Curated annotation (Swiss-Prot):
Mg(2+) binds at residues 223, 247, 251. It is found in: Cytoplasm. This is 3-isopropylmalate dehydrogenase. It is an enzyme of class 1 (oxidoreductase). The gene is leuB. GO terms for cellular component: cytosol. It catalyses: (2R,3S)-3-isopropylmalate + NAD(+) = 4-methyl-2-oxopentanoate + CO2 + NADH. Its cofactor is Mg(2+); Mn(2+). Catalyzes the oxidation of 3-carboxy-2-hydroxy-4-methylpentanoate (3-isopropylmalate) to 3-carboxy-4-methyl-2-oxopentanoate. The product decarboxylates to 4-methyl-2 oxopentanoate. Belongs to the isocitrate and isopropylmalate dehydrogenases family. LeuB type 1 subfamily.
Length: 356
């Protein structure tokens, strides 16, 4: 049965990196992948066209699709819009709308990029971490929230951090099942010494862990985890954490690899439907200059093939093509070093197509 993919170009470098990824998808379809795709706007592009960052047209297409591929959202030109209309709100809305509760962000260091990391090669060589982040709860979505005026006339900002047992249980299962396919270690990260939310998180993880006796469970406070990611990152296999801590730690982990431009991500619902996007932002400073690194988006397509289309063979085919291009010494500016060949976004796309 033909699988349907919704493609959202987004803002900034989004259209450029998506264009290269769609060329890869077209080649896979030509080689026999039974899939089709359709475009829809999200973020600033959607606001310009429909007056909303996640319009009804996009909602309908994404709800019907088997998977969604996204470039990036956000641009400084929208910073003065009311908060609900800003591009980033489109991303929060699609996650909530499709009930994408599990965010998987791998941080893998390719041997060819060992020198691109800011850490010593011996500390990061062979790095392979998966951060499993809960995506629809926590302080980003908790109510009540807002800015209010106190009796003394002073303004106060307030947010609510909370997690229910069921929200914690389902992300725990994702973390343990992911670890079973890897090195069988889960590190649950929170701040249980001061936050009741993560005290409950730890308790539930202990309970669910008993269902996975083959997986080793440990716990770490988030401040220590942030330090350990820099001190000795290879101790980690799967890191499982809440929304706000996961947001921060996954960005930190990405820099261990030398470039956030190399890192894909998947956000999944309970049935394997997902939103796939690079971990980096929309990089408006280089938009339209053909400088962006499309590899994270191409690797996001590989995750889409793996998790939503259940096509492990083609997922590996794409990942192998990316590694081959790196072995050939081709680099976009974000991962360039002396002795390698500097290429543009489209030239990197050409190289991946050739490697396929």
């Amino acid at each position: 049965m033909t699988k349907h993919i919704a493609i959202l170009r987004g803002d900034g470098i989004g259209p450029e990196i998506v264009a290269e990824t769609v060329r890869v998808l077209d080649k896979l379809i030509a080689q026999g992948l039974d899939a089709g795709y359709e475009y829809a706007p999200l973020g600033g592009e959607a606001y310009d066209e429909y007056g909303h960052p996640y319009p009804e047209f996009t909602q309908n297409l994404c709800r019907k699709a088997d998977a969604v591929l996204l470039g990036a959202v956000g641009s400084p030109q929208y910073d003065n819009l009311d908060r609900p209309l800003r591009p980033e709100r489109g991303l929060l809305a699609i996650r909530k709308d499709l009930n994408l509760f599990a965010n998987l962000r791998p941080a893998v260091l390719y041997p060819e990029l060992a020198n691109a990391s800011t850490l010593k090669p011996e500390i990061v060589a062979g790095l392979d971490i998966l951060i499993v982040r809960e995506l629809t709860g926590d302080i980003y979505f908790g109510e009540p929230r807002g800015i209010r005026v106190l009796e003394n006339g002073e303004r106060e900002g307030y947010n609510t951090m909370k997690y229910s047992e069921s929200e914690i249980r389902r992300i725990a299962h994702v973390a343990f099942q992911s670890a079973q396919k890897r090195s069988k270690k889960v590190c649950s990260v929170g701040k249980a010494n001061v936050l009741e939310t993560t005290e409950l998180w730890r308790e539930i993880f202990e309970e669910i862990g008993k269902e996975y006796p083959d997986v080793e469970l440990s716990h770490m406070y988030v401040d220590n985890a942030a330090m350990q990611l820099v001190r000795a990152p290879k101790q980690f296999d799967v890191i499982a954490t809440g929304n706000i801590f996961g947001d921060i730690l996954s960005d930190e982990a990405s820099m261990l690899t030398g470039s956030i431009g190399m890192l894909p991500s998947a956000s999944l619902d309970e049935n394997g439907k997902g939103l796939y996007e690079p971990s980096h932002g929309s990089a408006p400073d280089i938009a339209g200059q053909n400088k962006a690194n499309p590899l994270a988006t191409i690797l996001s397509l590989a995750m889409l093939l793996r998790y939503s289309l259940n096509d492990e063979a083609r997922a590996q085919q794409v990942e192998n093509a990316v590694q081959k291009v790196l072995q050939q010494g081709l680099r976009t500016s974000d991962i360039y070093e002396e002795g390698t060949k500097l290429v543009s976004c489209s030239e990197m796309g050409d190289a991946v197509l050739a490697a396929l």
